[in-house]
């Protein structure tokens, strides 16, 4: 299916925080309670609509183990968005966020949108990290924040789509160079610039209407 833009995402965070389950819930709308550990990198994709435009999200789900960290780093540079995930029932996964964030910012483009996600909100009785702590971390580091549940699908859709909206706004503001695919954005056949001052605004107009995802 044709699209106006393709956005590349990377999902990062400790092992067992629910990264693969979040991806599966978003792409397939199902929860798989027993999930094999990700070895290296897994992939998913889905079409969404923003501002009447078809956007394809290409999502790379990374392994949380230290042994695969070098592989994960190689995917940072080509990402427009990152979902940084911790488990609200495991304090250590929250404590490791600073390391993940430093890694992401060191190896990615400076404009990458980062969404902080506190996953497993359905397990509130086992919560070790208060929501206010997640909000404070996000404020301190300039991140978007949301709590989700891959099991119940709570806020999963919103987390992926709101990240895309942030990226789209940066495109409209001219922050992203959309001609440089290293920024994690690819122009599709539907691309029809609404702002003539945007980089790459000379592209041909695509179809205004298309099928739903």
UniProtKB/Swiss-Prot annotation:
<feature type="binding site">
    <location>
        <position position="16"/>
    </location>
    <ligand>
        <name>GTP</name>
    </ligand>
</feature>
<feature type="binding site">
    <location>
        <position position="33"/>
    </location>
    <ligand>
        <name>GTP</name>
    </ligand>
</feature>
<keyword id="KW-0547">Nucleotide-binding</keyword>
<dbReference type="GO" id="GO:0003924">
    <property type="term" value="F:GTPase activity"/>
</dbReference>
<dbReference type="GO" id="GO:0000287">
    <property type="term" value="F:magnesium ion binding"/>
</dbReference>
<dbReference type="GO" id="GO:0016192">
    <property type="term" value="P:vesicle-mediated transport"/>
</dbReference>
<keyword id="KW-0458">Lysosome</keyword>
<dbReference type="GO" id="GO:0005525">
    <property type="term" value="F:GTP binding"/>
</dbReference>
<keyword id="KW-0460">Magnesium</keyword>
<keyword id="KW-0378">Hydrolase</keyword>
<dbReference type="GO" id="GO:0031410">
    <property type="term" value="C:cytoplasmic vesicle"/>
</dbReference>
<dbReference type="GO" id="GO:0106104">
    <property type="term" value="P:regulation of glutamate receptor clustering"/>
</dbReference>
<keyword id="KW-0342">GTP-binding</keyword>
<dbReference type="GO" id="GO:0061175">
    <property type="term" value="C:type II terminal bouton"/>
</dbReference>
<dbReference type="GO" id="GO:0061909">
    <property type="term" value="P:autophagosome-lysosome fusion"/>
</dbReference>
<feature type="binding site">
    <location>
        <position position="15"/>
    </location>
    <ligand>
        <name>GTP</name>
    </ligand>
</feature>
<feature type="binding site">
    <location>
        <position position="20"/>
    </location>
    <ligand>
        <name>Mg(2+)</name>
    </ligand>
</feature>
<keyword id="KW-0966">Cell projection</keyword>
<feature type="lipid moiety-binding region" description="S-geranylgeranyl cysteine">
    <location>
        <position position="213"/>
    </location>
</feature>
<dbReference type="GO" id="GO:0048786">
    <property type="term" value="C:presynaptic active zone"/>
</dbReference>
<dbReference type="InterPro" id="IPR050209">
    <property type="entry name" value="Rab_GTPases_membrane_traffic"/>
</dbReference>
<dbReference type="GO" id="GO:0099175">
    <property type="term" value="P:regulation of postsynapse organization"/>
</dbReference>
<feature type="lipid moiety-binding region" description="S-geranylgeranyl cysteine">
    <location>
        <position position="212"/>
    </location>
</feature>
<dbReference type="GO" id="GO:0000421">
    <property type="term" value="C:autophagosome membrane"/>
</dbReference>
<dbReference type="GO" id="GO:0032482">
    <property type="term" value="P:Rab protein signal transduction"/>
</dbReference>
<dbReference type="GO" id="GO:0005886">
    <property type="term" value="C:plasma membrane"/>
</dbReference>
<feature type="binding site">
    <location>
        <position position="21"/>
    </location>
    <ligand>
        <name>GTP</name>
    </ligand>
</feature>
<dbReference type="Pfam" id="PF00071">
    <property type="entry name" value="Ras"/>
</dbReference>
<keyword id="KW-0770">Synapse</keyword>
<dbReference type="GO" id="GO:0120281">
    <property type="term" value="C:autolysosome membrane"/>
</dbReference>
<feature type="binding site">
    <location>
        <position position="35"/>
    </location>
    <ligand>
        <name>GTP</name>
    </ligand>
</feature>
<comment type="function">
    <text>May be involved in bidirectional endoplasmic reticulum (ER) to Golgi trafficking. Together with Rab7 involved in promoting fusion of autophagosomes and endosomes with lysosomes, probably through recruitment of the HOPS tethering complex. Involved in biosynthetic transport to lysosomes. In larval motor neurons, mediates the biogenesis of presynaptic cargo vesicles and their long-range axonal trafficking to synaptic termini. Not involved in axonal trafficking of mitochondria.</text>
</comment>
<dbReference type="GO" id="GO:0006888">
    <property type="term" value="P:endoplasmic reticulum to Golgi vesicle-mediated transport"/>
</dbReference>
<dbReference type="InterPro" id="IPR001806">
    <property type="entry name" value="Small_GTPase"/>
</dbReference>
<keyword id="KW-0813">Transport</keyword>
<dbReference type="InterPro" id="IPR027417">
    <property type="entry name" value="P-loop_NTPase"/>
</dbReference>
<comment type="subunit">
    <text>Interacts (GTP-bound form) with Vps16A and Vps39; the interaction with Vps39 is probably direct.</text>
</comment>
<dbReference type="GO" id="GO:0033292">
    <property type="term" value="P:T-tubule organization"/>
</dbReference>
<feature type="binding site">
    <location>
        <position position="18"/>
    </location>
    <ligand>
        <name>GTP</name>
    </ligand>
</feature>
<keyword id="KW-0472">Membrane</keyword>
<keyword id="KW-0636">Prenylation</keyword>
<dbReference type="GO" id="GO:0000139">
    <property type="term" value="C:Golgi membrane"/>
</dbReference>
